[in-house]
From Swiss-Prot:
It is an enzyme of class 3 (hydrolase). It comes from the Bacteria. GO terms for biological process: DNA repair; DNA replication; negative regulation of DNA-templated transcription; proteolysis; SOS response. The gene is lexA. Residues 62-86 have a biased composition (Basic and acidic residues). This is LexA repressor. The record marks 121-122 as: Cleavage. Residues 36-56 bind DNA. Keywords: Autocatalytic cleavage, DNA damage, DNA repair, DNA replication, DNA-binding, Hydrolase, Repressor, SOS response, Transcription, Transcription regulation. GO terms for molecular function: DNA binding; serine-type endopeptidase activity.
Length: 232
């Protein structure tokens, strides 16, 4: 840190400068930071763990800030001025300058959501729990809490507008209210359904007449679906 309390650009390696440049470009062009994989491609880092390490170092140096009340939300701040002479990695590109503010002091909060495999919306399949990557989404859209993303497989939630191949953002919580869409674990397998409780018991309801309700007395609620995304 400099005497005025601001981060010291001299403490940055060439690669760290490139990472900050990539983040800045993405924020300027589309309003949110790049994914872990995009950062790695641009900075010449092959593994997501290497990118995560560099991001932690940048946080320690004061160039990134995480909000303790918003898990995985990152504020990008104090981005230093750089030129196009030093680029780490074969896929590096010149940063845009036209019409762009060159040094945003504080970007909107962004949640880096871990992608943890697929979730069944039909006949349940075993959910893959390995984190594949992190995907940046505006915190204003996905909200607070421990969040993760799962891909929907199957047609059982079709009539609710949740289609095969969609991505759902799930907020981890062990309980659900009547009518909420949830990710639930049943005998080691995961599925997304509507939570329903009545005199006959607890049920996970599909939104497709071709599928039957699932008795859920022994189901584990993994979380509430808070957002649905689709690639057109």
């Amino acid at each position: 840190m400099l005497p005025n309390g601001k981060p010291d650009p001299a403490s940055l390696s060439d690669r760290q400068r490139r990472i900050l440049e990539v983040i800045r470009d993405a924020v300027v062009l589309r309003g949110y930071p790049p994914s872990i994989r995009e950062i790695g491609d641009a900075a010449g880092l092959q593994s997501t763990s290497s990118v995560a390490y560099q991001l932690k170092e940048l946080e320690k140096k004061g160039f990134l800030r995480r909000d303790p009340n918003k898990p995985r939300a990152v504020d990008v701040r104090h981005l230093p001025e750089t030129d196009n002479r030093t680029k780490a990695g074969p896929k590096a590109k010149a940063r845009p300058t036209a019409g762009a503010s060159p040094q945003p002091e504080l970007a909107s909060s962004t949640s880096f959501i871990p992608v943890v495999g697929k979730i069944a919306a039909g006949s349940p399949i075993l959910a893959e729990q390995n984190i594949e990557e992190y995907y940046p989404l505006p915190a204003d859209i996905v909200g607070d809490g421990e969040l993760y993303m799962l891909q929907v497989v199957g047609e059982s939630m079709r009539d609710a507008g949740i289609l095969d191949g969609d991505w759902v953002v799930v907020r981890s919580q062990p309980v659900a209210e009547q009518g909420e869409f949830v990710a639930a674990m049943i005998e080691g397998e995961a599925t997304v359904k509507e939570f329903h409780k009545d005199a006959s018991g607890i049920w996970l309801l599909p939104h497709n007449d071709s599928f039957a309700p699932i008795p859920a007395e022994n189901a584990e609620i993994m979380g509430k679906v808070v957002s649905v995304m689709r690639k057109l």
